[in-house]
UniProtKB/Swiss-Prot annotation:
Residue stretches spanning the membrane: 42-62, 284-304
Zinc finger (RING-type) stretch: 348-387
Name of the featured protein: E3 ubiquitin-protein ligase APD4
Phenotype of gene-disrupted mutants: Plants lacking APD1, APD2, APD3 and APD4 are defective for cell division in male gametogenesis resulting in severe abnormal bicellular-like pollen phenotypes.
Membrane topology term: Multi-pass membrane protein
Catalytic activity: S-ubiquitinyl-[E2 ubiquitin-conjugating enzyme]-L-cysteine + [acceptor protein]-L-lysine = [E2 ubiquitin-conjugating enzyme]-L-cysteine + N(6)-ubiquitinyl-[acceptor protein]-L-lysine
Gene name tied to this protein: APD4
Single GO molecular function: transferase activity
Disulfide partners: none
One GO BP annotation of this record: mitotic cell cycle
Tissue distribution of the protein: Expressed in the shoot apical meristems (SAM), root tips and inflorescences.
Entry keyword Disulfide bond: no
Organism: Arabidopsis thaliana (Mouse-ear cress)
Length: 399
């Protein structure tokens, strides 16, 4: 019987102890994953802020060109938080009369109505068109009376939003109804009424797509909205072709500028046009301050999340590492290891050979023998349970 028992192999073989590098990888993998996640979030948020800054500087507060006719008034009201000054430049510096008014720390300039009438007689050749710009504020009302000669002829009266050079490239573009703000096929005599709901530049075009010349008579009665500039704190007459209005940073909301063109008469005709470019000088200190605040907030958030991770300990370990975590847990967290023999609880969680006869200071965790604990302090220097820095490895002597 003795010889038979000696030939029997044990039913359970203890797995070889993990290497020191494997034990460190268990706890360092989640730390590196958390670091990558933090860097990814940081990069995404800073990238979004950079994209928003570019959109503000070159999009919302980018330069724009505006055509003005007589009796026009443009209200410009950017935020002085992001804009340092408003610049207006006359691109076709040939006609005087433009004025720029500035309002600092005041309410929005009030609007008032001005009525004026213009008459135009247009000879429109076959497959051609004629047009002119307006800048109309919200609330403006227009009555356009027309008479087309010879009788039976028809033309298209089109009003488009935006700058006129978008519509001078092709005559067919004007004929399509979906590209215009107002599209009308007119013949004989009649009247068109229009109410402006958006302050914007408009371009009125009379297009003749037929193969014969026509004559178009237009009587345009306009009840236009202009802005009162009597209470302005700044005035510039474009004497050198451009004006600049500096925003008041102490009043970040109530800052406005108004650009006006002269009324009809006194050397101003209905054919006069002014072409200006509006641009904004960015307040770079505001963008820098917002970037600094966002950067500080992100660093503080990452710092607190790292603190919470340290307090959470091994809560970030994956399911595959749960068995190894149980071997390294404190006495109070050994519920998941009830199926392990009681004798294994007192063995070193690193080598599974020597008893646990040391503790780490200052955290006080006891998970390894003195030899393995000394090696951990020398190689990594952090407790494998709480990841706190190990100051001393204290040996425990038992009776």
């Amino acid at each position: 019987m003795g010889s038979i028992r000696g030939d029997l192999q044990p039913l359970f073989v203890m797995p070889p102890p993990p290497l020191d590098e494997d034990c460190d990888d268990i706890f360092n993998s989640d730390e590196s994953s958390w670091g990558l996640l933090s860097l990814s979030c940081f990069g995404i948020i800073m990238g979004l802020w950079f994209f928003a800054s570019v959109c503000l500087i070159f999009g919302v507060y980018g330069s724009e060109t505006v055509w003005l006719g007589p009796n026009s008034s443009i209200l410009v009201k950017p935020s002085s938080i992001f804009v340092k000054s408003i610049n207006a430049k006359e691109l076709d510096f040939s006609k005087p009369g433009l004025q720029l008014y500035g309002f600092n720390g005041q309410s929005t300039p009030s609007g008032y109505f001005v009525n004026w009438t213009e008459s135009r007689v247009l000879s429109v050749s076959q497959n051609s068109y004629k047009g002119w710009p307006y800048y109309l504020n919200r609330g403006t009302h227009m009555n356009i009376s027309y008479n087309i000669l010879p009788k039976g002829s028809a033309v298209r009266l089109v009003i488009t939003e935006g700058m006129p050079f978008f519509y001078r490239s092709s005559l067919k573009d004007i004929a399509f109804r979906d590209t215009a703000w107002s599209w009308n096929l007119i013949q004989g005599s009649g009247m068109i009424q229009l109410d402006i709901s958006k302050s914007k530049g408009y371009y009125l075009t009379v297009a003749n797509l037929k193969r014969k010349d026509v004559e178009v008579e237009l009587d345009i009665d306009v009840k236009v909205v202009l802005y009162d500039t009597k209470q302005s704190s700044y005035n510039c007459s474009f004497s050198n072709g451009e004006c600049s209005f500096k925003m008041n940073e102490r009043s970040p909301v109530e800052n406005y500028a108004v650009v006006t063109s002269p009324a009809l008469g006194q050397g101003v005709s209905i054919d006069d046009e002014w072409y200006i470019e509006l641009s904004y000088q960015p307040r770079l200190i505001a963008y820098g301050s917002f970037t600094g605040v966002l950067l500080s907030f992100m660093l503080v958030a990452i710092h607190f999340c790292n603190k919470l991770k340290c307090c959470g300990g091994e809560g970030f370990l994956s399911e595959d590492d749960s068995v190894r975590t149980c071997l390294l847990a404190d006495k109070g967290d050994n519920d998941c290891c009830n199926d392990v023999e009681a004798s294994n609880k007192s063995l070193c969680a690193i080598c599974f050979d020597a008893p646990r006869d040391c503790c780490f200071l200052p955290c006080g965790h006891c998970v390894s023998c003195y030899q393995c604990g000394t090696k951990i302090k020398r190689t990594k220097g952090r407790c494998p349970i709480c990841r706190k820095k190990i100051m001393h490895v204290k040996r425990i002597y038992t009776a």
